[in-house]
A protein has these predicted regions:
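Short juxta-domain linker segments that transition from a proline/glycine-rich
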Residues: 1-32, 173, 177-180, 186-189, ...
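Residue-level detector of the short coil/turn that links helix A to helix B
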Residues: 22-24, 73, 116, 156, ...
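Amphipathic alpha-helical segments of tetratricopeptide repeats
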Residues: 1-2, 33-45, 79-93, 126-137, ...
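Amphipathic alpha-helical repeat scaffolds of TPR domains
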Residues: 4-21, 50-72, 98-110, 142-156
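Long, leucine/valine-rich, helix-dominated scaffolding and oligomerization segments
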Residues: 15, 24-35, 48, 68, ...
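Long, low-complexity regulatory tails in eukaryotic proteins
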Residues: 110, 122-201
Length: 201
């Protein structure tokens, strides 16, 4: 690893640490992450899809920037993230970059769901689930199942319909078991809490 990349990675981890420990704001973290990424590649070049090769580190930095951005900037960056993942798959096949694909596309799916684009969100989550099953990976299965469940619930709310408690409970049970197998304690606790809320309805 080159010295520049070493410094870049250390600065990246430090920025996330400062944000997680509430020593800097999300906006300050975002500014720092942009500066870190631009030590090796301009953010604008990525947004305009003019940078053909990005290292795994640069993709992770970009993902974190997109994830922490807000408003129109977030929308623009998420579209760029979607385009990058499509290009990775077309050039290398999904198996080569599956970890990066899962991470970025799960965030894109969540963004589309929050923006009310439920079908687009579901389509991405379905692809993640399918590819994870083919490649025998469990890492993102619970998140993709929960994303689809969240979209389903939002559709029901918007239509004024009544949710199927049994269906919600069973889907959350899947999420709990998968999170447990992956030793994702925080996610397991989150799904368990949601399941208890369903039981009280």
């Amino acid at each position: 690893m080159e010295p520049t990349m070493n410094r870049q990675e250390i600065a990246f981890l430090n920025s996330l640490y400062l944000w997680h420990t509430e020593r800097i704001t999300k906006q300050e973290c975002l500014i720092s992450l942009k500066e870190i990424l631009e030590k090796t590649v301009p953010l604008e070049k990525i947004r305009q899809a003019k940078e053909e090769y990005l290292s795994d580190g640069e993709l992770i930095y970009f993902y974190n920037i997109a994830d922490k951005a807000e408003g129109e900037e977030k929308a623009d960056l998420m579209e760029s993230a979607h385009a990058i993942c499509k290009r990775l798959v077309s050039e290398n096949g999904i198996g080569t970059d599956i970890s990066i694909y899962e991470l970025m596309m799960d965030s894109v799916a969540s963004y589309y769901g929050n923006a009310g684009k439920y079908d687009r969100s579901d389509e991405i989550s379905d692809k993640i689930i399918k590819e994870d099953l083919v490649l025998r990976r469990m890492t993102m299965l619970h998140e993709s199942i929960y994303n689809k469940l969240w979209n389903h619930s939002e559709r029901i709310k918007e239509s004024g319909g009544e949710e199927d408690k049994k269906f919600l409970y069973e889907e959350l049970e899947k999420c709990i078991r998968l999170a447990e197998l992956c030793k994702e304690i925080f996610s397991e606790e989150f799904y368990t809490k949601k399941q208890k809320e369903v039981s009280k309805k």
